[in-house]
From Swiss-Prot:
Belongs to the cytochrome P450 family. GO terms for biological process: omega-hydroxylase P450 pathway. The gene is Cyp2u1. It comes from Mus musculus. Heme binds at C476. This is Cytochrome P450 2U1.
């Protein structure tokens, strides 16, 4: 009888078969062990006082289906998670808050995510504990594309504070100082008016006209120039940006966050994204180079000029500085992408709500006629005398909430929020859509009612709970400029036209298209000259 250590394969058995079986069994055992350890780890996390939430699955957490392309997601496996495919993530998370509370948590893989769904928890986190809740989560796709520079996605720290402080003060300068964008916005509206009137009484989509106008205002701010709506290079860059955002949000590019080297795959959306990056980079870097060649220290014309002058000042002081061409490039990208998409969609929502609510549109027309008349362009100085128009814009912002989940935050250290433990490195989602639909704060929150922003005397009522631009250290740095654009462009549109939906058309779906921003579904309007 042979010993156990001297066993030989039976007759006819392949020599490597037993080894293969043992290896397979060992691999399965390791997988089971990993699943068990993951399950134990997740259970321990729940026991450590973190906010309540659904039970996570081992390894994949609560949203494992998000790791799989939509067309490969089997319905039987998704269960309730499939609702994220039929409603926006902001709506789905708001529904979860009804079950688990205004502060709840879930896991994506092993990553803990905490969602804040009401104003009080948002204010405590972003204002009262701002130093803890102001970082950004590490995401390989974003890190590769931005080199962790710029303002929007950069990590919170001394360099970010320097760049943010300069950018914010420069934007304020353009909003209030001698380089104010007000006349440029009014000038741009002349092109909007001309483009819309070409359609006569025929239905048309306002999207390309509004998008071109808002993009040109950002170009005036950043580049000191505007582009004709028929300029092929300008249209191409806008198309690149739109396509880049689309494939980042709705394709297999999310796999880069799991395996960063996927970014370099030579096919599909991976290859397309790299080409889009190269084309946009070429466009922006050419403009920066032109500014360097024509820079006049005594007469800065735009954001790039101001940044280049500050760079020279820092270098002349012979001190280490974070101000360089790389940072300028990514900040310009932030301003262009974030500033164009959000304001464009806010204006589109305004036109849609006016088309659906002719009674409100009529009151806006009456206030414009009373304060401004028909013979002069609107000015920011008119704002104080136009509370109903302001309230209308604010109500559209509240209901549309074009950035429904804000940009994700991350905790830089362990903390406690309203009695719950929030570990260091937790991803924090701010559901601004839920904050602005909270029935505890907003009466009949789903109704369109501008009067909720007016007091008994018809004057504008400033509500602390109205935070469409966010709050805290990461509040939108372009808030003032966005408000200026929205007011001047909206009033100019209302002063000139009456908007309506085409006769016989169906009412557009008002849920919006969830992406980087919450855009209205495509719609057409008709106009009549006033």
């Amino acid at each position: 009888m042979s010993s156990l250590g001297d066993q030989r394969p039976a007759a006819g058995e392949q020599p490597g078969a037993r080894l293969h079986v043992r290896a397979t069994g060992g691999a399965l055992l390791l997988c089971l062990l990993a699943v068990l350890l993951g399950w134990v780890w997740l259970r321990r996390q729940r026991a450590c006082g973190i906010p309540p939430g659904p039970k996570p699955r081992p390894l994949v957490g609560n949203f494992g289906h998000l790791l799989v392309p939509r067309f490969l997601r089997p319905q039987f496996w998704l269960g309730s998670g499939s609702q994220t495919d039929t409603v926006g993530q902001h709506v789905y998370l708001a529904r979860m808050a009804r079950v688990y509370g205004n502060i709840f948590s879930f896991f994506i893989g092993h990553r803990l995510v905490v969602v804040l769904s009401d104003f009080h928890s948002v204010r405590e986190a972003l204002v009262q504990q701002a130093e803890v809740f102001s970082d950004r989560p590490r995401m390989p796709l974003i890190s590769i594309m931005t080199k962790e520079k710029g303002i929007v996605f950069a990590h919170y720290g001394p360099i970010w504070k320097q760049q943010r402080r300069f950018s914010h003060s420069t934007l304020r300068h353009f909003g209030l100082g001698k380089l104010s964008l007000e006349p440029r916005i009014i000038e741009e509206f002349a092109y909007v008016k001309e483009a819309m009137q070409k359609h006569g009484e025929a239905p048309f989509s306002p999207f390309p006209i509004i998008s071109n106008a808002v993009s040109n205002i950002i170009c005036s701010l950043c580049f000191g120039q505007r582009f004709d709506y028929t300029n092929k290079e300008f249209k191409k860059v806008l198309d690149f940006m739109s396509r880049g955002l689309e494939i980042c949000l709705h394709s297999q590019l999310f796999l880069i966050n799991i395996c960063p080297w996927f970014y370099y795959l030579p096919f599909g959306p991976f290859k397309e994204l790299r080409q889009i990056e190269r084309d946009i980079s070429c466009f922006l870097k050419n403009i920066i180079r032109e500014h360097q060649e024509s820079l006049d220290a005594s007469n800065p014309q735009d954001f790039i000029d101001m940044y280049l002058l500050h760079m020279e000042e820092e270098q002349g002081a012979s001190r280490r500085s974070s101000f360089d061409e790389d940072y300028l490039f990514y900040i310009i990208g932030d301003l262009f992408i974030a500033g164009t998409d959000t304001t464009t969609n806010s204006l589109l929502w305004c036109l849609l709500y006016m088309s659906l609510n002719p009674d409100v549109q009529k009151k806006v027309h009456e206030e414009i006629e009373r304060v401004i008349g028909c013979d002069r362009a609107p000015s920011l100085t008119d704002k104080a005398q136009m509370p109903y128009t302001e309230a209308t814009i604010m109500e559209v912002q509240r209901l549309s909430m074009v950035v429904p989940l804000a940009i994700p935050h991350m905790t830089s250290e362990k903390t406690v929020l309203q009695g719950f433990t929030i570990p260091k490195g937790t991803v924090v989602l701010i559901n601004l859509w839920s904050v602005h639909r909270d029935p505890a704060i907003w009466e009949k929150p789903d109704d369109f009612c501008p009067h909720r922003f007016l007091d008994d005397q018809g004057q504008l009522l400033k509500r602390e709970t109205f935070i469409p631009f966010g709050i805290g250290k990461r509040v939108c740095m372009g808030e003032q400029l966005a408000k200026m654009e929205l007011f001047l462009m909206f009033v100019s549109l209302m002063q000139t036209f009456t908007f309506a939906l085409p006769e016989g058309s169906e009412k557009p779906v008002m849920t919006g298209r969830f992406g980087l921003t919450l855009a209205p579904h495509p719609f057409n309007v008709t106009i009549s000259k006033r």
